[in-house]
A protein has these predicted regions:
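Pre-Walker A (pre-P-loop) alpha-helix and adjacent loop at the N terminus of AAA/AAA+ ATPase modules
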Residues: 1-23, 254-256
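Walker A/P-loop
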Residues: 17-55, 138
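Short glycine-rich substrate-engagement loop in P-loop NTPases that contacts/grips substrate
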Residues: 53-80
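Loop/turn-to-beta-strand initiation segments
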Residues: 79-84, 110-118
Length: 256
């Protein structure tokens, strides 16, 4: 797809006519499977190849386009040279007007804007089958499968490394056990779940460090216990995560 875009640009630069093949894409999968990260990577590649002039990734929730369809043309105008990333794009199903405006703008800015529509596979397929015009413009559909438990543990390791946090040899076993007992439904969160776990542990470690400093003075803090996750940090984070999961599922089911 990128090679074809490059060939078309060379043809246009040399005054040759080109046959339009849409570069727009659909990223299909559950939350936390890397769709946004891949969109950002794609933007950088397209800029490096001189296929996009700006290379921003403009993230737009589809619900905002459904509620105010007239904003779609101005969205594309402001996104010239960039990628428009539409999250939960299946929400467009509720507004044929928004879909029509989207298709029209995708054609008008076909050489200047790349659209990526993201969402759950089943709902996205329903969206595309509801409008053949939209389907014909989203020629590339890429599946983002859920991460395995081992991959999620590796993501935990990477996130800790990036944030310069350490832990003892038992921590990864505890993390894997906690991940393994989760209900891996579409609301699980994948890498987002791991990020939330790490951030909760960071909050707990920070609070523990301050308590130690207040009770024993700053001299009690050394390089070994600073930015070091303990079992207590992890267990307290697990409690917070489980409570948040319960709240989220109640809201999803329509309870208050």
């Amino acid at each position: 797809r990128i090679d074809f875009m490059r060939a078309q640009k060379i043809q246009r630069d040399r005054g040759k006519s080109t046959s339009f093949v849409p570069a727009h894409m659909a990223f299909l999968g559950n939350p936390g499977t890397g769709k946004t990260e891949v969109a950002n990577l794609l933007a950088r590649i397209l800029v490096e190849k001189n296929l996009l002039s700006v290379g921003k990734v403009i993230q737009v929730p589809a619900v905002s386009l459904v509620s105010v369809p007239p904003v779609i043309p101005s969205l594309f105008e402001n996104a010239r040279g960039s990628i428009i990333f539409i999250d939960e794009a299946y929400t467009l199903l509720s507004s044929p007007t928004a879909i029509s405006s989207m298709v029209e703008s995708m054609d008008r800015y076909k050489n200047e804007v790349v659209v990526i529509m993201a969402g759950y596979s089943e709902e996205m397929n329903e969206l595309f089958h509801s409008n053949p015009g939209l389907m014909s413009r989203i020629r590339s559909q890429i599946d983002f499968p859920d991460y395995s438990d081992d991959e999620l543990v590796q993501i935990f390791e990477l996130m800790c490394l990036q944030r310069e946090y350490q832990y003892d040899s038992e921590m990864l076993k505890l993390v894997k056990q906690f991940i393994s007992i989760q209900d891996k439904d579409r609301y699980f969160g994948n890498a987002r779940f791991v990020r939330n776990l790490v951030e909760e542990m960071m909050l707990n470690e920070g609070a523990r460090t301050v308590r130690l400093c207040d009770s024993e003075g700053e001299d009690a803090i050394n390089d070994k216990n600073l930015k070091f996750f303990t079992k207590d940090d992890f267990e307290e984070a697990c409690v917070s995560i489980q409570q948040e999961i319960k709240r989220s599922k109640r809201l999803t089911l329509g309870f208050k």
